[in-house]
């Protein structure tokens, strides 16, 4: 597979854009996104907040993000976030079970509620009342907002990856 348009040339980018690309290991997604340096900078700012700030449990966050990638059929996203998930404490069993999480026994009640919430956001555009109430009973309002924004952000990211047909890279090259 080859991307639908050429990746941006980092040597022609602003210093700020080059710095952000370097911090993100010049991953193909970021090289493509850097065609629009203003959007790229803001995308990375929000992505950084999602991944390193807030109170949402990182395991719940990464399960939801990886599940979003699965549902959006974005292999790049799935591969990257399974590795990120492993780095925050997701087990191999959990990563392997995500495609059919409903039948798996390796998720906590909170994780299952978050995965149901994720599925319905992606598939139905919004969760049903029952699903919303189930996750709202488990999370603080801040963590609930963070979960929804994480899913929404990674729907956008998955669609970006697939629209431009971003080339897969060895995960060890793009995720620490």
Predicted segments, located by residue:
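Hydrophobic alpha-helical segments
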Residues: 1-176
């Amino acid at each position: 597979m080859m991307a639908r348009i050429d990746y941006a040339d980092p040597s022609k980018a602003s210093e700020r854009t080059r710095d952000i690309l370097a911090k993100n290991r010049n991953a193909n997604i970021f090289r493509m996104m850097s065609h629009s340096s203003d959007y790229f900078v803001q995308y990375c700012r929000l992505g950084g907040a999602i991944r390193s700030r807030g109170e949402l449990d990182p395991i719940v966050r990464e399960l939801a993000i990886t599940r979003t990638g699965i549902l959006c059929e974005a292999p790049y996203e799935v591969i990257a976030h399974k590795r990120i998930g492993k780095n925050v404490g997701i087990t191999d069993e959990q990563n392997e079970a995500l495609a059919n999480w409903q039948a798996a026994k390796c998720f906590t009640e909170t994780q299952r509620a978050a995965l149901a919430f994720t599925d319905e956001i992606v598939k139905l555009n919004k969760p049903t009342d029952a699903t919303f109430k189930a996750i709202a009973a488990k999370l603080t309002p801040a963590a609930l907002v963070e979960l929804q924004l994480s899913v929404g952000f990674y729907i956008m990211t998955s669609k970006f990856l697939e629209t431009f047909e971003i080339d897969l890279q060895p995960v060890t090259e793009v995720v620490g």
